[in-house]
Amino acid sequence: MNTQSQTIVVKLGTSVLTGGTLKLDRAHMVELVRQCVHLKKLGHQVIVVTSGAIAAGREHLNYPELPKTMANKQLLAAVGQSCLIQAWQSLFAIYGVNVGQMLLTRADLDDRERYLNARDMLQALLKNGIVPIVNENDAVATNEIKVGDNDNLSALVGILASADKLLLLTDQSGLFTADPRKDPKAELIKEVHTIDETLRKIAGGSGTALGTGGMATKLQAADIARRAGIEVVIAAGSAENVITDVVDSKPQGTKFLPVECALESRKRWILAGPASNGTIVIDDGAVNAVQQKGSSLLSKGISSISGHFVRGGVAKIVNTKGELIARGISRYSSDDLHKILGKHSQDIYAVLGYEYGPVAIHRDDLVLI
């Protein structure tokens, strides 16, 4: 067993916690808890990102079918979250371990100060030997109950905690060359060095009815985490000793190797935190300058703007084919950029009557994707 202290984020999908049924599988949950506690005893820090609130609420209320309306889904989440945290609390208590609940929303990560507060709270729990149990605040977060929820959340939590490993446990044994449920010739991809369009095409859509994340969202989460220097493993939550095996570097599922030059703290926040409310399309010359030369983005290289964002807001940067190039904090609002796009830096003041510097997005505020 690897005894060097590590911080491990374990994301447990609804399919893992329910075993494909309509209620929580507490017998399996206690086995997962046993593995987490074993890691703690070896000096590792463990964070659990849990799905299952809607499933727990449906079980508790004996709800006949999965509701279609947002309000009723959030009703089940509100009831189920208390059941879910009670289940985790009672199971960890068997081993004398305390847990602390953290319910996050996108707003907690969009704002830099709130992001840092969340990071400090997470670190405080870990330093006091408490296992953080993290979930999206489903009852109020309208953007959560759709594809991408806790997979992406677990990557963001990994960044908050400066984690070493992120385990995305699901009902599949990892990422395959095709959907193994449909193609008997599908082969497990054991190790991934680069996430490209080929892999994205292999990844499918949403998974189970009770859950909201499919392999595509896990791939997206893996890409975010590995860019922050975190090793990611997608594996079957039902596999024997899957958590302890991954930490001990034994083969389980699909391993995504982290990027060697991990991002510094502020750029991690740009990558993980704020939602992008607008898109900046840049020409080929600007793409080359940003990607190959590490330059700042100038207004001259901007072809068009879509969406709305304020000065200091985060925008997606794409090439003329619509391919995502980067994310960055804009020094000018979208309204201002509409006026100065294609203009030389020295012309900004003449056009606007003011300026916030010669660049649209400084390279220190730019994260390549």
Swiss-Prot record:
The gene is proB. Belongs to the glutamate 5-kinase family. It catalyses: L-glutamate + ATP = L-glutamyl 5-phosphate + ADP. Gene3D superfamilies: Acetylglutamate kinase-like, PUA domain. Pfam families: AA_kinase, PUA. It is found in: Cytoplasm. Catalyzes the transfer of a phosphate group to glutamate to form L-glutamate 5-phosphate. GO terms for cellular component: cytosol. Its EC number is 2.7.2.11. Pathway: Amino-acid biosynthesis; L-proline biosynthesis; L-glutamate 5-semialdehyde from L-glutamate: step 1/2. This is Glutamate 5-kinase. Residues 277-355 form the PUA domain. PROSITE patterns: GLUTAMATE_5_KINASE, PUA. One of its GO terms (biological process) is L-proline biosynthetic process. It comes from Aliivibrio salmonicida (strain LFI1238) (Vibrio salmonicida (strain LFI1238)). Keywords: Amino-acid biosynthesis, ATP-binding, Cytoplasm, Kinase, Nucleotide-binding, Proline biosynthesis, Transferase. Substrate binds at residues 51, 138, 150. Its main location: cytoplasm.
